[in-house]
């Protein structure tokens, strides 16, 4: 059985910028799953209706599951904000996406290691897009603590 993964917004942004490491990693996935928050962030980044149509077409081509927010996800995100906003700069979108991955028991593929590495119970795969991050777009996986 293929492990469950959730793709963070930042990795999809790298993909749209033509990053080969992002393309390679995402092509390896049999199916894509994103949080509703990720979809909203991507849609907000569209410049016009044609851009939005391309986004929707691209996500549909990959049979992307957009995971809706639930009460449990919202409550867990609020806990993450309480625990990590002041100490680690946790922001709303990151808390909601992290809480979604926890609720799904999915590994979150993300470049946002700074905020998400402190989240207990979150399994994440660090996508490191910059050569200065030591591994030129390859990933490192951390199981949940």
Q: Would you name each region that the model predicts?
A:
Residues 23-27, 114-121:
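Short loop/helix-cap segments at secondary-structure boundaries that form the rim of catalytic
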Residues 11-12, 38, 73, 96-97, ...:
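Alpha-helix capping/helix-boundary segments
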Residues 12-13, 40-43, 117, 125:
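Nucleotide phosphate-binding site architecture
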Residues 1-34, 44-58, 131-134, 143-145:
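Short, well-structured N-terminal submotif of metal-dependent ribonuclease cores
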Residues 8-9, 42, 77, 101, ...:
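Generic structural signal for small/hydrophobic residues in well-ordered secondary structure
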Residues 3, 65-111, 133, 137-145:
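Active-site neighborhoods of divalent-metal-dependent phosphate/nucleic-acid chemistry enzymes
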Residues 70, 121-131:
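Short beta-strand->loop
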């Amino acid at each position: 059985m293929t492990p469950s993964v959730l793709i963070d917004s930042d990795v999809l942004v790298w993909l749209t910028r033509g990053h080969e490491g992002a393309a390679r990693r995402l092509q390896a996935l049999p199916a894509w799953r994103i949080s509703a928050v990720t979809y909203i962030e991507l849609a907000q980044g569209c410049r016009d209706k044609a851009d939005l149509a391309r986004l929707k077409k691209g996500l549909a081509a990959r049979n992307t599951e957009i995971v809706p927010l639930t009460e449990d996800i919202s409550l867990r995100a609020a806990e993450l904000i309480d625990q990590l906003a002041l100490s680690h700069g946790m922001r709303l979108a990151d808390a909601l996406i992290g809480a979604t991955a926890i609720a799904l028991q999915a590994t979150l593929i993300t470049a946002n290691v700074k905020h998400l590495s402190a989240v207990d119970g979150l399994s994440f795969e660090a996508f490191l897009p910059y050569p200065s991050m030591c591994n030129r777009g390859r990933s490192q996986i951390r199981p949940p603590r």
